[in-house]
Swiss-Prot record:
It catalyses: (2R)-3-phosphoglycerate + ATP = (2R)-3-phospho-glyceroyl phosphate + ADP. PANTHER family: PHOSPHOGLYCERATE KINASE, PHOSPHOGLYCERATE KINASE 1, CHLOROPLASTIC-RELATED. This is Phosphoglycerate kinase. Substrate binds at residues 21-23, 37, 60-63, 119, 152. It comes from Chlorobium limicola (strain DSM 245 / NBRC 103803 / 6330).
Length: 397
């Protein structure tokens, strides 16, 4: 997917309208608890400012349901960006309208304005053409650097590209496409994928697409119990998707047919309930007692999965191995994170597909030891499913 990027255009004196993903978590006092998404947009932002562009930033934050709500204002993001850049960032009162247009036209080279939350208008998520056109009129060049929303055809990501001549990718999207794209198109082998999370249903398309690309798949998280039950094993009170048992068997058969090594856990950590003070122990997967719940992969599985990861040249991970929100049941997930960091040090390319896995790696303090951590949970999943992302497809080739 070769798309034009920021590096391909001249910016000097131009109004550059950039879609960023500043959907950051806020606490009750409206303080940003994690500014990772703002920091990740800095390379594109700095490039535009340093090259004399007039930068207009737009983003959504949370789910304000199509009407103005100060709880979802982007003011904290503008303030944090101003600190990071050490220069003023003007905060607009809206994202469209006469007043905003006047503020935008008054910008000088190298100045920055942050538009208010796009989702204060229902037209954003409806991909309304008039709204998209009004947004487009603010800039002369459009840049999309919001990978996290690239799988959504919204006014600011897809509709807008019909009303601008120049629509290019920012550095963050370029990096995402480079790592995720290379992993799917021409990975160094062996290529190992690790999939976790609670449900098979959310990962079917990913699994089926990866079966055409990878050498080995390691499965963890609660979705293993649907596989176990399908194979006739007892699963106690663990989470099982009863309507996905046949599907689980067909996935096992597909893997065998395509000569893919599909590994399921050999042992499981079980507890009577999912709580931090529950008694827990490791048991073999064919010995899960009635009434017990599987909460993590066991030590033998951790060791086996580690070996597979260390033997790989490309590793892709999406989804935790257990209930990692509880420290005692996070050991399996942390073990995967550590194995990935060690594989990276040994020269492998390691990629984390956003969401919970990214949070787990951050929790383990290993984020800087992974080749690439995707910024888009849903977007990276759809990319791994082999789907075209509308926000990227719409950019200039």
């Amino acid at each position: 997917m070769q798309k034009k990027t920021l590096s391909d255009i001249t910016i000097q004196g131009k109004r550059v309208l950039m879609r960023v993903d500043f959907n950051v978590p806020l606490d009750e006092e409206k303080n940003i608890t994690d500014d990772k998404r703002i920091v990740e947009a800095l390379p594109s932002i700095k490039k535009i400012i340093e090259n004399g562009g007039r930068l207009i930033l737009m983003s959504h934050l949370g789910r304000p349901k199509g009407k103005p709500n100060q709880d979802f204002s982007l003011t904290p993001a503008a303030e944090r960006l101003s600190e990071l850049l050490d220069c003023p960032v003007i905060m607009a009162g809206d994202c469209i309208g006469t007043e905003v247009m006047q503020q935008v036209l008054a910008l000088q080279d190298g100045e920055v304005i942050m538009l208010e939350n796009l989702r204060f208008h229902p037209e954003e998520e409806a991909n309304d053409p008039d709204f998209a056109k009004e947004l487009a009129s603010l800039g002369e060049i459009y840049v999309n650097d919001a990978f996290g929303t690239a799988h959504r055809a919204h006014a600011s990501t897809e509709g807008i590209t019909r009303y601008v001549q120049t629509a290019v990718a920012g550095y963050l999207i370029e990096k995402e496409l480079m790592y995720l794209g290379k992993a799917l198109q021409e990975p160094e082998r062996p290529f190992v994928a690790i999939l976790g999370g609670s449900k098979i249903s959310g990962k079917i398309d990913v699994l089926e697409n990866l079966f055409n690309k990878v050498d080995t798949v390691l499965i963890g998280g609660a979705m293993v119990f649907t596989f176990f039950k399908a194979q006739g094993l007892g699963t106690g009170n663990s989470l099982v998707e009863e309507n996905k048992l046949e599907l689980a068997l067909s996935l096992i058969e597909q893997a065998a047919r395509k000569n893919i090594k599909l590994l399921l856990p050999q042992d499981i950590i079980i507890a009577p309930e999912i709580s931090a003070d529950a008694e827990s122990m490791a048991v073999a997967v064919n010995a899960i007692p009635d009434g017990m719940i599987g909460v993590d992969i066991g030590p033998e599985t951790r060791a086996a999965y580690r070996q597979e990861i260390l033997g790989a040249r490309t590793v892709l991970w999406n989804g935790p191995m257990g209930v990692f929100e509880i420290d005692r049941f996070a050991e399996g997930t942390i073990a995967i994170a550590e194995a990935m960091a060690d594989a990276t040090a040994a020269g492998a390319t390691t990629i984390i597909g956003g969401g919970d896995s990214a949070a787990a790696v951050a929790k383990a303090g290993l984020a800087d030891q992974i080749t690439h951590i995707s910024t888009g949970g849903g977007a990276s999943l759809e990319f791994l499913e082999g789907k075209e992302l509308p926000g990227i497809a719409a950019l200039n080739d």
